[in-house]
């Protein structure tokens, strides 16, 4: 399936002219091969993403462009940050201080910390294998939240509400971090119970 992601000013071109061109090109031959082009499954129009309060402009040198970003920070930082500020319902703004804050506080401190805690805990306490066991009450509640979060996130992604999906991922990782804090698996007497939930 083909998805188009574009700014609101390009919606007419991608919903009328481009599909019309593809339909008109039906049964086109390229050399001896007959080709049909795939129509967009969904066109997602966004509001504007601004650069520190200004419109992006290549001619004025306002903004940062895709050929430059990979040299500055890991590409996953960019994916995360841009997904977190997608202008799906109103214009949004790229801001360096917000970029730094979200990377440090959300991606690293929340998600990265959780990933490290879980994998390190499994490696240290269970020889790197996820243990099987019975859930306690807190574990059952967390598992229920996981199922609810997974259903929401699946629907968000299916509806192409990517920022909402990301927000739901991070809401759940916050719940798991709270669970770890409450259970204190670093105290050996709690390791088995927490291992059951993992």
Q: Whereabouts are the PLM-identified features?
A:
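NTP-dependent nucleotidyl-transfer catalytic core
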Residues: 1-5, 12, 25-41
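Glycine-centered helix-coil hinge/cap
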Residues: 7, 73-74, 161
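Active-site and channel-lining beta-strand-loop segments
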Residues: 20-21, 31-61
């Amino acid at each position: 399936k083909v998805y188009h992601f574009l700014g609101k000013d390009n919606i007419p071109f991608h919903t009328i002219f481009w599909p019309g061109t593809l339909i008109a090109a039906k049964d086109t031959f390229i050399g001896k091969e007959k080709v049909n082009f795939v129509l967009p499954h969904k066109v997602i129009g966004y509001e504007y993403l601004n650069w520190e309060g200004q419109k992006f402009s290549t001619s004025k040198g306002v903004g940062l462009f895709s050929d430059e970003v990979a040299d500055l920070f890991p590409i996953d930082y960019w994916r995360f940050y841009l997904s977190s500020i997608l202008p799906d319902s109103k214009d949004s703004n790229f801001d360096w201080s917000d970029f730094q804050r979200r990377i440090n506080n959300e991606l690293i401190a929340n998600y990265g910390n959780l990933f490290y805690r879980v994998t390190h805990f499994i490696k240290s306490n269970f020889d790197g294998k996820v243990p099987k066991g019975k859930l306690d009450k807190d574990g059952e509640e967390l598992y229920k939240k996981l199922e609810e979060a997974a259903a929401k996130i699946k629907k968000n992604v299916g509806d192409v509400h990517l920022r909402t999906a990301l927000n739901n991922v991070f809401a759940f990782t916050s719940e798991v971090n709270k669970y770890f804090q409450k259970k204190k698996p670093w105290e050996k007497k709690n390791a088995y119970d927490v291992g059951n939930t993992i």
